[in-house]
């Protein structure tokens, strides 16, 4: 995967990518703009597990894998099949898991079973959330009059159903100058046909395909975009350990919030706020790439502040002991719908305790929401660091956190000392942003600050 560490190869790569300014932008849909991939994966795992379980109960000859390993095998196969048209993905799944032999099911039947479970567009189905930063990016491109297209493996009918359940509904589709669906092409991704179609509908000649910037979340999509001659940004929907599968992309970002359009000759976002009292120094191990020279640390105020409330639970036991930075962890499970609105990364805001320590007041807080790559965590965590010294632990007390701004993506570090230094710098960004009055919109939450 590309690295942000400065060297001649990286400089040459950046120059090559920026050589031809991008004039048009093409988006994938699922996993890039709307968060359907996780929903589909859960359904696939459930359906396939049920099939294998029934087969196992009716036959003495079946996989010797434990249930846990079997589910991980299914989940891996579902992830690897992402980005394709439904039947193509089902064919890959059946082949990878040997389902015709192990469960007596063919690709078409598997697809029908999964579709019956999903039932996009039906009443009562939970809203499909937008990917963090999706609407911000689409609105900005529209405002700057940059032509955009949608190139999705989803069929026209399925697109209609999905957008009915989408958080923003049909509104999102109004931002596109052209829409291309999977049933309009003979071959699906990783074949480049759909990106050729999108380019043509945007009025871009084949020899100018390099002026199109594509946003994709899967290796199949990246392969298709590059085969079409486009420049491709990957915002991976796969787990971090699979990031090597995105080596073909021109850029890899952790989320749409981290995208720096100016690196591609497009207008620069204007909503980041510099904290001029905190110098910017690129972190060792930060995997983001940017050709932009920054002088100061910065933050991005959330379009909507987010409240997270729950009992303080015991975390991994490393905040105080290893880092000297005590965190008050919250349980992810009951807060899943809220944190799905946030990209994994570092945020700041405020926190208050609602139990015996309520009298300590409202405290500024820096928090990690994600997978903490330094410790290679496999499950998501919410780890607020309250910038206040407490006399005692407060496990099981109710903690309310108001998430106000995004600071940066998660990144890995080579040493614990580097990690600690970075966390303390995040705290400085939080303190300085509030001290300098750089965060507006807090008045709308004045009732929250009342204890």
Give residue spans per PLM region.
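Solvent-exposed alpha-helix faces
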Residues: 49, 230, 424-428
